[in-house]
Regions:
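Long, charge-rich intrinsically disordered scaffolds of nucleic-acid metabolism proteins
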Residues: 95-96, 108-112, 444, 450, ...
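Single-stranded RNA-binding regions, centering on S1/OB-family and related RNA-binding modules
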Residues: 585-805
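Accessory alpha-helical DNA-binding modules that contact the DNA backbone or grooves
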Residues: 42-43, 54, 58-166, 384, ...
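A glycine-rich phosphate-binding loop feature that marks nucleotide/adenosyl-phosphate handling sites
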Residues: 199-206, 363-367, 421-422, 446-453, ...
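Long, charged amphipathic helices and adjacent flexible linkers at domain junctions
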Residues: 325-333, 338-343, 495-526, 631-679
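Duplex nucleic acid-engaging cores and interfaces of nucleic-acid transaction enzymes
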Residues: 45, 61-64, 71, 75-362, ...
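C-terminal accessory/binding modules appended to enzymatic or scaffolding proteins
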Residues: 19, 24, 353-357, 365, ...
Length: 805
């Protein structure tokens, strides 16, 4: 039975449904994206080469459309199933059909379907089988004024007519108990009541945590031992990491976790009387709503039974179900936010500035067994390896001579040192050796994150079957400096460790997002067809792992590719794959100059006609010759404004790399460990991870420091990613060092403001400026500051809760 009718919704289309969730996406582009995707086009291809059809939608919008269509289809499929099931039962009214057909929210759909779901043998089902539904209907109707009891008629008297030994109803009390079970089910399955309860929890509910049975001392969850926060606040992506922290504490049994209304103040005791126990106002409000729904005639003799049913329906059925839904909603928002943070950080790392195709010497640091040294040539090919010892004076001297000789003879242009254990020590030795030998070769610290995973992987074994793990690691470190993207695609992005709570989120959703990011980065940069590994080629639009291996195998047998067109000779490389992939592949050795640009072969004909009209070779349109292309109104009309602009950009700088120019970076040479740090010390650093609560910065002491969000700038910062990104070079000031916890608090604020946290300002005011990076100047304090006091905002508050980095 339905207490009231929900308003019938207007017919909803996919476009209007998606536009409500993503108002920034223009409706006309949605159909084009879905049509192209249905034809087998990839997201990078649609974003790069079909801008005229989509209105230049970016990859984020295109993925939102494709993912949204999948969600829409699942909702429509569920609608169809529910309608069919209820119709099969002969209970589908026109009103119910309209409500189901007009509902595009899965929880609400399930609310409407709940009364008609096939049920297990519940107490209500047993009561119906015992013939007690008429008694339940009489109680309900009397309680709502639909029926007036006969003079002297009572619930007990009415119930006595239903006594039956055969049906196991021994007395009136048993009959009434069965009727109440039916009413409990009726109330708990009512869509309107469930919707109202859900809304109250989402709008006014609080997530609450208290100290759990297995709480440790000290505990990283101490801030949550007596904590509550509005569900509405935690549903905002920028705050959702706090819910993940609460959930992790609950899973580790250091916290209890529940939902409810705001905790009221403890009533004051008066004249020796014990204060009343505070009640949950949200629970009281919901109970009043359920009791009113169960009985509108308080003078009816059966009113207490109906109110009892209301209490039980609310507390035993509806609240647990709704709390699960709210937790699920909070988890989904938190998962999406954490995955987005991780994906953005991975993107920044993958697009780090490359040192370029130059010979590099890689150093995998080690104390006991020595540093493994590997040399790679300008193409990244492994040349040879050796060991450098750091511990003994004799070992250092001999290793130093050997190192200097390697650099001279190998034409080494840079030394890449892993930033793991003994990394700073190795860096110092290498610098001293090169300086003493008069060699002006940059020494660069390179992140080892994920290098050990690669070294032990099947990929590394296939690539270097006869080499030791540590030598593989040194090779990877050298190659990471040459081309971070080409080397990092060999590593599972999850092992790079640049997220927040990534081990707590859905593995499937995380992997899907990271795969999309890697694909996006590879296609954004482009791939040299003649040097790329099969792992890199696999991420090119339309290719995939199998075809990537076929390309490398063909290249090994036939030699380098001389044209994009020759790709069609590779087995299984179809015309459709060519369409999707060709524009992202570069061939420096090609006879056709456009084969080393991002211009798609489908546009060659237009440019060749233009060159013919101008009386110049096609190469004459590149570089300075692009001015004649810019002047061609006919070509602009033929290609469309978006494609024309992209073609001009490619012709201006053929084979351009969208990544920033590499600039060497050095740590302070007088600090190597936490013990070397002093309060107020200013240090250069590299941002290694950005989370919702701040940024982690490597200052060269084997332990990243935290710049809390309140210490990122003199201005209010809502999102740390507005200020910094992984790989950015920054200048930071040491605020606090906790040797016992191996924690460092840092600040990027000016000296006068570094010790005071400022509150939020009106939205849009004092927005921080642009981003830093390898190719840009450092950000943060540049002059020695006054001695700071302990910051008002505890910079370790979030650090203590972070795991899975």
């Amino acid at each position: 039975m339905v207490l009231s009718s929900l308003p019938a919704m207007a017919q909803v289309t996919f476009e209007s449904w998606l536009a409500a969730a993503h108002p920034e996406i223009p409706v006309p582009g949605m159909a084009a994206v879905l049509r192209l995707a249905g034809e087998g086009a990839t997201v990078p291809f649609i974003a790069r080469y079909r801008k005229e059809q989509t209105g230049a939608l970016d990859e984020v919008a295109i993925r939102a459309i494709i993912d949204g269509k999948e969600n829409w289809d699942s909702i429509c499929k569920r609608q169809t199933f529910i309608l069919g099931e209820i119709e099969r039962q002969g209970k589908l009214t026109d009103e119910l059909r309209a409500r189901i057909s007009g509902t595009y929210d899965l929880p609400l759909l399930e609310d409407l379907y709940l009364p008609y779901k096939q049920k297990r043998k519940t107490k209500a089902v047993i009561a119906r089988e015992a013939g007690l539904e008429p008694l339940a209907n009489w109680l309900w109707d009397c309680g709502h004024g639909l029926v007036t009891p006969a003079p002297g008629e009572t619930p007990d008297g009415r119930a006595s007519a239903f006594i039956s030994e055969e049906k196991k109803v021994p007395d009136a009390d048993a009959a009434l108990a069965g009727a109440v079970e039916i009413i409990i089910e009726r109330l708990s399955e009512n869509a309107d009541l469930r919707t109202a309860t859900r809304s109250r929890y989402m709008d006014d509910g609080f997530t609450k945590t208290t100290k759990g049975e297995k709480a440790k001392s000290p505990s990283k969850f101490e801030n949550y031992f007596a904590y509550e926060e509005r569900v509405q606040v935690l549903m905002k992506p920028e705050n959702s990491h706090r819910y993940l922290a609460m959930r992790r504490g609950w899973m580790e049994e250091e916290l209890t976790l529940h939902l409810g209304g705001p905790t009221p103040r403890e009533p004051a005791e008066a004249e020796g009387k014990r204060a009343a126990v505070p009640v949950d106002p949200l629970a009281e409000e919901l109970l009043a709503m359920f009791e009113a729904a169960a009985c509108s005639k308080p003078d009816f003799a059966g009113a207490p039974l109906l109110k009892k049913a209301a209490r039980f329906a609310l507390r035993a059925h509806v609240v647990p179900a709704i709390e699960n839904e709210v937790h699920k909603a909070l988890r989904e928002v938190a998962d999406e936010a954490a995955i987005r943070v991780f994906a953005e950080n991975v993107r920044k790392l993958l697009l780090s500035a490359p040192f370029g195709p130059k010979a590099v010497l890689g150093v995998d640091p080690g104390l006991r067994t020595g540093c493994k040294i590997a040399v790679v040539d300008d193409s990244g090919k492994y040349v040879g390896s050796t060991v450098m010892h750091l511990e003994s004076a004799g070992g250092k001297a001999g290793s130093g001579n050997m190192l200097a000789e390697l650099v001279r003879k190998g034409g080494i242009r840079a030394v890449a040192v892993g930033n793991g254990t003994a990394g700073r020590e190795a860096e110092t030795v290498v610098r001293d050796v090169l300086t003493a030998a008069g060699l002006n070769v940059p020494v660069v610290m390179v992140s080892e994150a994920g290098a050990s995973v690669y070294s032990a992987s099947d990929v590394a074994r296939d690539e270097f079957p006869d080499l030791d793990l540590t030598v593989r690691g040194a090779i990877s470190i050298a190659r990471r400096l040459q081309d971070p993207l080409a080397e990092l695609v060999k590593v599972d992005p999850k092992s790079i460790g640049v997220g927040q709570y990534q081990h707590d989120v859905s593995p499937t959703a995380l992997q899907k997002s990271l795969d999309a990011v890697v694909d996006s980065c590879v296609n954004q940069v482009g791939v040299n067809l003649n040097t790329a590994s099969h792992l890199l080629l696999a991420h090119v639009s339309g290719i995939g792992p199998g075809l990537a291996k076929a390309i490398v195998e063909y290249r090994g047998k036939k030699g380098i590719f001389r044209s994009r067109q020759s790709l069609l000779e590779v087995p299984r490389f179809s015309a459709k794959v060519f369409e999707q992939a060709a524009g992202f592949l570069r061939i420096p050795e090609a006879a056709h100059p456009l084969d080393n640009t991002g211009v798609h072969p489908e546009r060659y004909g237009s440019l060749e006609k233009l060159a013919e009209r101008l009386g110049v070779p096609i190469a004459g349109l590149l570089g300075a010759g692009v001015q004649s292309v810019k002047a061609s109104r006919e070509l602009q009309q033929e290609l469309g404004a978006f494609t024309f602009a992209d073609v001009v950009k490619e012709l201006e700088k053929p084979g351009r790399d969208p990544r920033e120019t590499f600039v060497p970076f050095s740590y302070r040479q007088d600090i190597h460990t936490l013990q070397d740090l002093e309060l107020g010390m200013v240090c250069p650093g590299i941002v290694t991870n950005v989370t919702n609560f701040g940024a982690f910065v490597d200052i060269g002491v084997h332990q990243d420091g935290l710049v809390h969000i309140s210490q990122l700038a003199d201005k209010f910062v809502k999102d740390p990613r507005e200020v910094v990104s992984p790989g950015d070079r920054v200048s930071v000031r040491v605020l606090e060092v906790k040797l016992d916890k191996q924690q460092i608090a840092l600040s990027m604020r000016s000296g006068s403001n570094a010790d005071v946290a400022r509150g939020p300002r009106p939205s849009g005011q004092d927005r921080p400026g642009g981003q830093g990076g390898y190719g840009k100047g450092p950000r943060g304090p540049s002059a020695p500051p006054p001695q700071p006091s302990r910051p008002f905002n505890n910079p370790f508050a979030s650090l203590d809760k972070l795991r899975g980095r």
